[in-house]
From Swiss-Prot:
It is a multi-pass membrane protein. Its EC number is 7.1.1.-. Belongs to the complex I subunit 1 family. The keyword Manganese does not apply. This is NAD(P)H-quinone oxidoreductase subunit 1. Its main location: membrane. Keywords: Membrane, NAD, NADP, Plastoquinone, Quinone, Thylakoid, Translocase, Transmembrane, Transmembrane helix. It comes from Thermosynechococcus vestitus (strain NIES-2133 / IAM M-273 / BP-1). It catalyses: a plastoquinone + NADH + (n+1) H(+)(in) = a plastoquinol + NAD(+) + n H(+)(out); a plastoquinone + NADPH + (n+1) H(+)(in) = a plastoquinol + NADP(+) + n H(+)(out). NDH-1 shuttles electrons from an unknown electron donor, via FMN and iron-sulfur (Fe-S) centers, to quinones in the respiratory and/or the photosynthetic chain. The immediate electron acceptor for the enzyme in this species is believed to be plastoquinone. Couples the redox reaction to proton translocation, and thus conserves the redox energy in a proton gradient. It is found in: Cellular thylakoid membrane. NDH-1 is composed of at least 11 different subunits.
């Protein structure tokens, strides 16, 4: 049973019923997914920033944002408006073009990665056969922007931050890719929808986290490092590098870095839920629920209900990991740069390789349980 509705098909059919041609209806549909992607990512970031402030306040026994909107929910929006009206400063003797392009090179690939994130069977922008591979490829572009920003700023702290960002990304991209490859091996594909469908047959027992506990830990640690979250925020360590590659940035350029960091955090949490925790699938298979209720699986109201519940489940799982990442930031000390590189090259890389080989062996030995 499909746990979603075909939004594109229904939108085009609705426009055709109004007298528009199929080609024109399809043309009107094209900008909508990108607009939806921007809205979903931006709202997700606003919620993540608000959670960051409230959770950090709770950890430190403070109140946090309180007056701007109910429970301070509009505080991130106020911050964004404040940064819009700040002066855009260009440092002396800096490289104007690289300095301007740096934030865009960081943010654009992260937003584009949302096209592969599924919230339901048909609730995604593009069901690409190489979806997860596309995300890994796009995530490898962002460090180039950080290096550009650090180099172009004509500041030693910015340059050190950019170099650290490049070294950190290279160190953790490979373990991240190995963890994803192990999941793709079990799912017999790199598409995010295929990966979720493979986990939905038996409910919670089908989730990849039970068959890939080592891969899940490798992926989660590497994802935190890619997001530059504590304890892996070496590129912008305030106590060492002022603000790292962000030191000379102000106004909207600084806001783009800030936005990119939280968009990447929410994206990583969504992908953890998709790859290891069944994405939109429920702990109890929805087919079982439909049979217990005595309702036909093709019932349109049931399809809509399952679509809404699928989005809810995806967000609950994702924001649990956002909460975990925020909690780690305020409870774990920062590692040194040598410890960070040792963790990536001497621990996560060998563990990721062993996990991949172990997955291949188990797939051959137990093909039913491991997707043979």
């Amino acid at each position: 049973m499909e746990s979603g509705i075909d939004l594109q098909g229904q939108f085009i059919s609705a426009l055709q019923s109004l007298g528009l041609s199929h080609d024109l209806a399809k043309l009107l549909w094209l900008p909508l997914p990108m607009l939806m992607m921007l809205i979903v990512a931006t709202v997700g970031v606003l919620v993540a920033v608000w959670l960051e402030r409230k959770i950090s306040a709770a950890v430190q026994q403070r109140i946090g944002p309180e007056y701007i909107g109910p429970l301070g929910i509009l505080a991130p929006l106020a911050d964004g408006l404040k940064l819009i009206f700040k002066e855009d400063v260009l440092p002396a003797n800096s490289d104007r073009w690289l300095f301007t392009l740096g934030p865009a090179v960081v943010v654009i690939p992260v937003f584009l990665s949302y096209i592969i994130v599924p919230f339901g069977q048909n609730l995604l922008i593009s069901n690409l056969a190489m979806g997860v591979f596309l995300w890994i490829a796009l995530s490898s572009i962002a460090p180039i922007g950080l290096l550009m920003a650090g180099y172009a700023s004509n500041n030693k702290y910015s340059l050190l931050g950019g170099l650290r960002a490049a070294a950190q990304s290279i160190s953790y991209e490979i373990p991240l890719a190995l963890a994803v490859l192990a999941v793709a091996m079990m799912s017999n594909g790199l598409g995010t929808v295929e990966i979720v469908e493979q986990q939905s047959q038996y409910g919670i027992l089908s989730w990849n986290v039970w068959r890939q506990p080592i891969g899940f830990l490798v992926f989660w640690i590497a994802a935190l490092a890619e997001c530059e979250r504590l304890p892996f925020d070496l590129p912008e360590a305030e106590e060492e590098l002022v603000a790292g590659y962000q030191t000379e940035y102000a106004g909207m350029k600084f806001a783009l870095f800030y936005l990119g960091a939280y968009v990447n955090l929410v994206l990583s949490a969504l992908l953890v839920s998709v790859l290891y925790f069944g994405g939109w699938s429920f702990p109890i298979p929805l087919e079982t629920i439909a049979n217990l209720l005595g309702v036909s699986e093709t019932n349109p109201f049931l399809q809509i209900a399952f679509a809404v519940l699928g989005i809810t489940m995806t967000l609950i799982k994702a924001y649990f990991f956002v909460f975990l990442a925020i909690l780690l930031r305020w409870t774990v000390p920062r590692v040194r740069i040598d410890q960070l590189l040792d963790l990536g090259w001497k621990f996560l890389l060998p563990v990721g390789l062993v996990n991949l080989l172990l997955t291949a062996g188990l797939k051959l030995a137990f093909p039913v349980a491991f997707g043979g």
